[in-house]
Every structure is written in structure tokens, then in C-alpha cells.
Amino acid sequence: MNGTEGPYFYVPMSNATGVVRSPYEYPQYYLAPPWAYACLAAYMFFLILVGFPVNFLTLYVTIEHKKLRTPLNYILLNLAVADLFMVFGGFTTTMYTSLNGYFVFGRLGCNLEGFFATFGGINSLWCLVVLSIERWVVVCKPMSNFRFGENHAIMGVAFTWFMALACTVPPLVGWSRYIPEGMQCSCGIDYYTRAEGFNNESFVIYMFVVHFLTPLFVITFCYGRLVCTVKEAAAQQQESETTQRAEREVTRMVILMFIAYLVCWLPYASVSWWIFTNQGSEFGPIFMTVPAFFAKSSSIYNPVIYICLNKQFRHCMITTLCCGKNPFEEEEGASTTASKTEASSVSSVSPA
């Protein structure tokens, strides 16, 4: 074996030389130099420094401005809450453990950090699925009389929480487990071992199919149909400048959404699956650490792409930050008016 398996941990280094120690008790500087751990801590500090204000501001601005309290924005608020789960439950812990070079909070701390970080990530992932379904239903109108209302939004939020709990609770009760991963400073699902009594194999397959491939398929289908619908609407109104502008805007948003999804989750899912299907193969701690931290960065991508590019929200945010006045009032007002015109031209295809 090219790694060292112990009680509730797996260190990606052979213990032939006798240097491997428990990641709950000793610094892991034999895996990477201290400066590498310092870089991880600095990166987590950056995510906290950016992720907390942006997501908190999203919550505050939406609550402060009544016109933003729409059913669709319930999902966007839930997205911000999911990102804050990652910031407080995962990033703060990982920053502190990286500064120490090992997981100082022990087994209980590993369970809590793994749960909160995974819960936030999976919850936000299913929020994106609900958003894509909402956009598909509203724009493509597969059900002609359907109107997305408050009850639908509440059901959507409840669905994201149910799916997140369905992924994060089982490792706490014996179906798989949370263990330190990569450089042993953060915890995640055990993709590394086939430890007796935990049924890791079945859980990893379940997680990969239900919580990665399924969201990927749904998002691809919904946004693919959205692009086709916008193109059809533009083709019928070729002389309408606002329609053409709406097509470009929605297409850009779709591309950004899809790229962000892939950047955040494809590397992590791919590496996890490779490790799972090639157990016993040699790999270094950085091999798992880098994609895991790509996934954590979704707490920044989400509010920027899904909220800050929304003209109406941006106007309200600037007004809030500038104590009730928007110094770009004329420009923002014109953009908002144009956005409304575009929305009416192509059946409300604007991002939100």
C-alpha cells in the first residue's frame, strides 16, 4: 500500500520509514513543507475575507429592499446561506488547522468540519439545480399555465436542504465517514479506504451518481433548452435590438453558470473518483488538496455570478452601500429599464 491507514484517517504516504503520525495529534510537515500549509491558511483567509461580506451583503440587501423579496430570490437567499455554512463551518476551521499543520480539533472536530463544509457545498449545488429548473419552466414554458410562486420557492428551498442532509448525515451515522484528506488539514468523505463496517464503496457510488452526475445532467438540460428558446425568440424578432441584447446576456450568463459549476466541482469529483477506483495507487497529498480547494471557492463564484450580475440587485446593493443614494442612478436606472424591456421581449429570460 502506498498510504498509511489508521483509526479514522488515511495519510497518503507509506510508513516504511516510520515518519507517519496521526493527523489528529502531530504536524504533518513530512507531507509538505510548512510554507505550503501557510499558503493554504492564507487562501482560506482570502475566501473568508471575500465570501463572508459578499454573502452577508446578499442577505442584508434582499431583506432591506422589499422589491427583492420575490419567490425566485428565496432560492438565491438560500444559496447565500449555504455559502455562509461553508465559510463558518469549514473555512474558519481549515484556516486554523492549516496554521497548525494538522487537524488539531480531533475526531469530533473532523466530523463537524466535514459535515458543515460538505453540507454548504451540496446545498449550494442543489440550489443551482433548482434555479436551472425554475429558469427552464419560466422561459421555455413546458407547462403553459405554470407560475413560479412563493410555495414553489419554499418547496425548492426545502428540497435543497433535504438533498444536502441526505448526503451529509449518513457519514455521521456509519454509512461512510469523514476523515482528514489531502494535507490532513480539512475533512471530507472517505474516498480512500474500504474500511470494514463503513460501506464506503456504496456511499461513494451513491454520492457520485446522485449528487454529481444528476445535477450535471439537469443543469445541462435546462440551460441547453433555455439557449434554444432564446435563439428561437430572437429569430422571430430579428429587428428587435432589445431581443438580440437579451439573447447575448442570457447566453453569457448560461456559459458563466456552467463554467463555474465545472470549475468548482468537476476537478474534485474526478480526482475523488480516480482515488476511489485506484485504491492502493500512489498519489501525493497535493493531488487531493488542490481540487478540494477549487470546490471551496464556489462560495465566491455563486454570489458574483447568480446575484451581483443581476441589474436590479446591483442597483439595490449600491443604494445600500451608499447610504440610500446611488451615484450611478441614471446609468443603473437605464439598465434596469432596458432589462425590463428585454424580459418582456423574450418571456423574462433575464438571469433573475
From Swiss-Prot:
Membrane topology reported for the UniProt record: Multi-pass membrane protein
Biological role stated in the UniProt entry: Photoreceptor required for image-forming vision at low light intensity. While most salt water fish species use retinal as chromophore, most freshwater fish use 3-dehydroretinal, or a mixture of retinal and 3-dehydroretinal. Light-induced isomerization of 11-cis to all-trans retinal triggers a conformational change that activates signaling via G-proteins. Subsequent receptor phosphorylation mediates displacement of the bound G-protein alpha subunit by arrestin and terminates signaling.
Any single Pfam family the record assigns to this protein: Rhodopsin_N
Main location: membrane
Coiled coil: none
Residues at the site labelled Plays an important role in the conformation switch to the active conformation: E113
Subcellular location: Membrane; Cell projection, Cilium, Photoreceptor outer segment
Modified residues (N6-(retinylidene)lysine): K296
TM segment ranges: 37-61, 74-96, 111-133, 153-173, 203-224, 253-274, 287-308
Name recorded for this polypeptide: Rhodopsin
Keywords (A to Z) from UniProt: Cell projection, Chromophore, Disulfide bond, G-protein coupled receptor, Glycoprotein, Lipoprotein, Membrane, Palmitate, Phosphoprotein, Photoreceptor protein, Receptor, Retinal protein, Sensory transduction, Transducer, Transmembrane, Transmembrane helix, Vision
Keyword Chaperone: no
Domain of life where this protein originates: Eukaryota
Motif 'Ionic lock' involved in activated form stabilization in this chain: 134-136
Any single Gene Ontology cellular-component annotation: photoreceptor disc membrane
Glycan-modified residues: N2, N15
Single biological process term from Gene Ontology: G protein-coupled opsin signaling pathway
S-palmitoyl cysteine lipid sites: C322, C323
Outcome after substituting Y261F: Decrease of absorbance minimum from 504 to 496 nm
Region described as Disordered: 331-352
Cytoplasmic side: 62-73, 134-152, 225-252, 309-352
Residue numbers on the Extracellular membrane side: 1-36, 97-110, 174-202, 275-286
Family: Belongs to the G-protein coupled receptor 1 family. Opsin subfamily.
Paired cysteines (S-S): C110-C187
Post-translational modification note: Phosphorylated on some or all of the serine and threonine residues present in the C-terminal region.
